[in-house]
Design a protein with these regions (language model features):
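N-terminal pre-domain segments of enzymes
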Residues: 1-81
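Residue-identity detector for threonine
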Residues: 8-11, 40, 67, 103, ...
């Protein structure tokens, strides 16, 4: 794999850290309601690793490089927050184990699932996480968005 090229002076100036008028409330919101996380963050499928949350950890552990705009780096940090989250009464989301979020609504007879993710291993891991921490329920409806 080729090493990334350094930022040009123009890019460095454009991406220089600065006050963008954003506070840390978004980080508090992104973490609010987290109940649990996948034990390893690595979701295995029949063809190998389907998702690996640790591959996104670098955005939380390192400084913004001069090749990335500060607002994009911040968005990547917010997106790196993962796990099972309480959203509202009888509504939970699993975030950060696919390119989208999966929502679980506690129905009278089981889970109503909204947006079942893009691959089965991630959806299975999300369902397992919900069942483990919220109680085992069957899936009774799936809504694709």
């Amino acid at each position: 794999m080729n090493a990334p090229k350094p930022a040009t002076s123009h890019t460095q100036r454009a991406n220089a850290p600065r006050d963008l008028g954003m506070d840390d409330q978004d980080f508090d919101r992104a973490r609010r309601g987290r109940i649990a996380q996948h034990s390893t963050g690595v979701i295995e499928g029949p063809l190998g690793v389907a998702w690996d949350s640790s591959r996104h950890q670098y955005v939380l552990d390192s400084e913004q490089p001069d090749t990335v705009h500060p607002s994009l780096w911040r968005q990547a940090q917010l997106n790196a927050e993962h796990g099972l989250f309480s959203v509202a009464d009888r509504v939970w989301q699993v975030r950060g184990y696919d390119i989208s979020n999966i929502t679980f609504i506690e129905g009278e007879t089981g889970w109503i699932v909204i947006h079942p993710l893009t691959v089965e291993p991630a959806a299975r891991a999300a369902l397992d996480l919900a069942n483990e921490h919220l109680g085992e329920r069957p899936v009774v409806a799936v809504i694709y968005t």
